[in-house]
Amino acid sequence: MIKVSAPGKILWIGSYSVVFGGISHVIAVNKRVSCSLREIKEKDSLIFHTSYGHFKNSGNELINSVLDTFRERLSQLPQGYEIDLYNDKEFIIDGKKTGLGSSSAATVSLTACLYYAIHGKLDLFEIHKLAQIANYKRQKGIGSGFDIASAVFGSIVYKRFTDLDKMDFYFEKLNLGNYDMMLGFTGKSSETVGLVRKFVEKSNLDDFKEIMRLIDEENYMAIKLIKLNKLDEAVEHIKLGRKYLNYIAERIVGVKLVSKMEEELIKIAEEEGALVALSPGAGGGDSIFALGNDLNRVREAWSKRGIFIIDVKEDEGLRLESN
């Protein structure tokens, strides 16, 4: 039996700006999607058991995007296998996604499993390219691919590709280390693709481009300081970049990324010892991320307000569990 797993993610530097070619840092976390594959007697079949249902020979949109990519790019698809594709429980709470990147982790995990069945090894760059193609087509070109890259390579500095076939992305491994990290799930899911599309619609405006340039400058400086182990100083640049982002969202795009309740949760977290708290990824309401040396007081304060706490730790990228 082959078994692989891929991590969830937290995009805390580069939200939205990464879509337009800006630099980002994404943290791979220890909530994972596992995929296992074993041979069956039906040699012309693929049977899927997943967190979202059971399928034969084709599946949901995610599964089909991966299968189609294998047919198009490799001209072959392994047959005669039963496949289990399951999320850790924290990806979905009460039927709602928590923003940890279950779709990207599942795409990478399934891609890796099928690739291993064909080649008997894991080639991270080939798996990354196949998973990016499947994800890109499924999202109809919206998105930057940071989540797929992190699910393969772990915690990384990332700049998106400009060409899907060339896959001319930039990445650099950058682990944060042993900080206390958590997500506070607010109980509602955001619609990431819809939010990103609204930003794309305004992206040709001069004001939009100028403020995105300022955001990217702050993000570059934050990442430079993180590399020097100066997280306290980096946080100030992250916060300023966030102020610019909220300005674009509200004044130019016409959306509010952080609700009053989320603003209150961020304020509480920073008063109770978090080095930084923010709405990760595309924002829009699903979770608030907090990072610090000791977040116990934050956990207590958020829990009192009915927020579901998801403790996370930095984790590695795509992993072969057994073969």
UniProtKB/Swiss-Prot annotation:
Ribonucleoprotein in keyword set: no
Broad class of enzyme this protein falls into: transferase
Keyword terms: ATP-binding, Isoprene biosynthesis, Kinase, Lipid biosynthesis, Lipid metabolism, Magnesium, Nucleotide-binding, Transferase
GO molecular function: ATP binding; phosphomevalonate kinase activity
Cross-referenced InterPro entries: GHMP_kinase, GHMP_kinase_C_dom, GHMP_kinase_C_sf, GHMP_kinase_N_dom, Phosphomevalonate_kinase, Ribosomal_Su5_D2-typ_SF, Ribsml_uS5_D2-typ_fold_subgr
Documented EC number(s): 2.7.4.2
GO annotation terms (biological process): farnesyl diphosphate biosynthetic process, mevalonate pathway; isopentenyl diphosphate biosynthetic process, mevalonate pathway
Gene3D superfamilies for this protein: 3.30.230.10, GHMP kinase, C-terminal domain (3.30.70.890)
Cofactor(s) needed: Mg(2+)
UniProt subunit comment: Homodimer.
Family to which the UniProt record says this protein belongs: Belongs to the GHMP kinase family.
Full protein name: Phosphomevalonate kinase
Taxonomic source organism: Saccharolobus solfataricus (strain ATCC 35092 / DSM 1617 / JCM 11322 / P2) (Sulfolobus solfataricus)
Taxonomic classification: Archaea, Thermoproteota, Thermoprotei, Sulfolobales, Sulfolobaceae
